[in-house]
């Protein structure tokens, strides 16, 4: 429950991996910190959408699933027991005369000296197929998320998309499905070179450059009508499941309502991760600056920068930061 009379040092808005690590590091620095997360659990998009998908850009791990990463971060975070508000959305960030902020949320107000925005891609919805289909086919034949690999076991599966996520899903599905196809409208894939190499050397059947332009149900399976780009050639592919990876449409309008300066729907920050608002910082995928690389690994590096800079502003008289080996 929110306590409107308690003054936190730092409020982290967003409980994804980067927000969780920011709260942990703030705890290391003896800050009074809380996390506000709109979802029912911590972990953000990684935990909600991709619990069984392996992540390859976290230092120290050859590969780690979203669920494993979230569990590790939760165990780490528990060391300092930060206040955590789940299923709570921030509606407004209101500056006060004394330099603090009142946050209006869906569950009341909370008071904080500083804010770290770590909301990932904001509210997101999957970019859907641009063809008509029966609504009941969704989550039966057609999937936009793949939370459990077991549902694809021994199935014929098509993956639509040509980026990192589509390639990664296809490679994971190859381990459990009877047959995997990947359908992309371009000849070239847009994934990491190592992932594309793995795809080319796999048993996955590649359908390029094709676009799905029709769907029909045939004997409890899904028939895909494939149109070859810049051609009248057509193919039909019959599958048990279709996993669509066309990316997500993000809604970051609330950030502008908070008074933050945006650049192409992301929060503009300087090299200290500071926004245009005093004592408000942004990290992770929502933050942008020249040379930004949108990886979890980048966000993990941005978190200590934001925490350190914020605490320096709040408590300039305190000794600034020690190595973890000196304080743990």
Curated annotation (Swiss-Prot):
Its EC number is 1.18.1.2. It is an enzyme of class 1 (oxidoreductase). Binds 1 FAD per subunit. SUPFAM superfamilies: FAD/NAD(P)-binding domain. One of its GO terms (molecular function) is NADP binding. Keywords: FAD, Flavoprotein, NADP, Oxidoreductase. FAD binds at residues 37, 45, 50, 90, 124, 285, 325. Its cofactor is FAD. It catalyses: 2 reduced [2Fe-2S]-[ferredoxin] + NADP(+) + H(+) = 2 oxidized [2Fe-2S]-[ferredoxin] + NADPH. It holds the Pfam family Pyr_redox_2. It comes from the Bacteria. PANTHER family: THIOREDOXIN REDUCTASE 1-RELATED-RELATED. Homodimer. Belongs to the ferredoxin--NADP reductase type 2 family. This is Ferredoxin--NADP reductase 2. It comes from Latilactobacillus sakei subsp. sakei (strain 23K) (Lactobacillus sakei subsp. sakei).
């Amino acid at each position: 429950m929110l306590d409107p009379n308690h003054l936190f040092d730092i409020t982290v808005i967003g409980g994804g991996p980067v927000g969780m690590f920011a709260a942990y590091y703030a705890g290391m620095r003896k800050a009074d910190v809380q996390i506000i997360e709109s979802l029912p659990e911590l972990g953000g998009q990684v935990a909600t959408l991709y619990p069984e998908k392996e992540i390859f850009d976290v230092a120290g791990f050859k590969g780690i699933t979203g669920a494993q990463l979230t569990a590790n971060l939760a165990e780490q975070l528990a060391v300092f027991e930060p206040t955590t508000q789940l299923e709570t959305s921030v509606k407004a960030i209101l500056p006060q005369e004394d330099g603090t902020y009142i946050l209006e949320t869906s569950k009341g107000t909370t008071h904080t000296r500083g804010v770290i925005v770590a909301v990932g891609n904001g509210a997101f919805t999957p970019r859907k197929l641009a063809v008509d289909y029966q609504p009941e086919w969704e989550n039966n034949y057609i999937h936009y998320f793949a939370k459990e690999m077991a549902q694809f076991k021994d199935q014929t599966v098509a993956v639509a998309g040509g980026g990192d996520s589509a390639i990664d899903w296809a490679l994971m599905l190859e381990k459990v499905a009877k047959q995997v196809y990947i359908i992309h409208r371009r000849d070239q894939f847009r994934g990491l070179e190592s992932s594309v190499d793995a795809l080319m050397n796999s048993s996955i059947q590649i359908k390029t450059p094709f676009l799905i332009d029709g769907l029909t149900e045939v004997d409890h399976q899904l028939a895909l009508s494939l149109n070859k780009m810049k051609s009248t050639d057509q193919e039909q592919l019959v599958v048990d499941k279709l996993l669509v990876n066309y990316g997500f449409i993000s809604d970051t309008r609330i950030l502008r309502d908070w008074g933050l300066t945006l650049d192409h729907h992301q929060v503009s920050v300087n090299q200290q991760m500071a926004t245009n608002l005093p004592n408000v910082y942004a990290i992770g995928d929502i933050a942008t600056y020249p040379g930004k690389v949108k990886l979890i690994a980048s966000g993990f590096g941005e978190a200590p920068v934001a925490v350190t800079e914020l605490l320096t502003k709040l408590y300039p008289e305190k000794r600034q930061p020690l190595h973890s080996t000196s304080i743990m």
